[in-house]
């Protein structure tokens, strides 16, 4: 399994250019946070990595490398990169139970799909009464439960890399805290490389090792999390950090 995945000079276009020469490096055991405002190109960059660009959007330049070798995104998706999506409700087939979802995921990847394995993954993400959960349909579960189920699927995949696209969006504060606890636990136990897409600098401060700031389809600043919080250089980064500090009655040093 690869130890590093690199996005090199990725450019995306629809009727007009959307993403301009984005380069990012994911490393096993480290969390790279990709931050920026809505419409900055974060989710499109993730979609390009997975080879699931929306209709009308095409990649016009760049490549993806695994341990320095060029690869097609379809060779990474699911097998080498698991995904935790922004809206879990749209990620599950409403006609299938959680048992069917989990079992089919395992079988597709050649992983054990016995009930004991599925139950262990459910319990690992803090969902009580795994036997009952596995019988539920998506519409019978809350957003927080579905997000934890999606994380359980990522655990079952045992992929060396994870893309978590706004994993705490639209969840209440308690559910958000539980999701962050789970992501921390995955990093400690499995040490994948994680691309964490978020606009919440509090999430960045808690989970990230490195940060890339995106604005208008470009990476405007990259660095380790401590440097970026203490000495942000770009105006967009300074605005994000200042807004975060203001929540605690603090100001960014000039």
Curated annotation (Swiss-Prot):
Its main location: membrane. It is found in: Cell inner membrane. Gene3D superfamilies: P-loop containing nucleotide triphosphate hydrolases. Keywords: ATP-binding, Cell inner membrane, Cell membrane, Ion transport, Membrane, Nickel, Nickel transport, Nucleotide-binding, Translocase, Transport. It is an enzyme of class 7 (translocase). ATP binds at residues 36-43. It is a peripheral membrane protein. It catalyses: Ni(2+)(out) + ATP + H2O = Ni(2+)(in) + ADP + phosphate + H(+). GO terms for molecular function: ABC-type nickel transporter activity; ATP binding; ATP hydrolysis activity; nickel cation binding. One of its GO terms (cellular component) is plasma membrane. Its EC number is 7.2.2.11. Residues 2-241 form the ABC transporter domain. Pfam families: ABC_tran. Part of the ABC transporter complex NikABCDE involved in nickel import. Responsible for energy coupling to the transport system. The complex is composed of two ATP-binding proteins (NikD and NikE), two transmembrane proteins (NikB and NikC) and a solute-binding protein (NikA). Belongs to the ABC transporter superfamily. Nickel importer (TC 3.A.1.5.3) family. This is Nickel import ATP-binding protein NikD. The gene is nikD.
């Amino acid at each position: 399994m690869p130890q590093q995945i690199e996005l090199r000079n990725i450019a995306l276009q629809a009727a007009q250019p959307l993403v301009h020469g984005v380069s990012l490096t994911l490393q096993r055991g480290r969390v790279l946070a990709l931050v920026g405002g809505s419409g900055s190109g974060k989710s499109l960059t993730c979609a390009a990595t997975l080879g699931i660009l929306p209709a009308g959007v095409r990649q016009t330049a760049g490549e993806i490398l695994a341990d320095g070798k060029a690869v097609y995104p379809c060779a990474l998706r699911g097998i080498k990169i698991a995904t935790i999506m922004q809206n879990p409700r749209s990620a599950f087939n409403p006609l299938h139970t959680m048992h069917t979802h989990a079992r089919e995921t395992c079988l597709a990847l050649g992983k054990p799909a016995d009930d004991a394995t599925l139950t262990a993954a459910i319990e690992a993400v803090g969902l009580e009464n795994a036997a009952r959960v596995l019988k539920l349909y998506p519409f019978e579960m809350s957003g927080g439960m579905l997000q934890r189920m999606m994380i359980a699927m990522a655990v079952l995949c045992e992929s060396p890399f994870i893309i978590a696209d706004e994993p705490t969006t639209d969840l209440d504060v308690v559910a958000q805290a539980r999701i962050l606890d789970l992501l921390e636990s995955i990093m400690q136990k499995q040490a994948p490389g994680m691309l964490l897409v978020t606009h919440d600098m509090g999430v960045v401060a808690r989970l990230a090792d490195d940060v890339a700031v995106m604005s208008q389809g470009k990476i405007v600043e990259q660095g380790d999390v401590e440097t970026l919080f203490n000495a942000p250089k770009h105006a967009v980064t300074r605005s994000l950090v200042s807004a975060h500090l203001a929540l605690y009655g603090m100001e960014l040093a000039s």
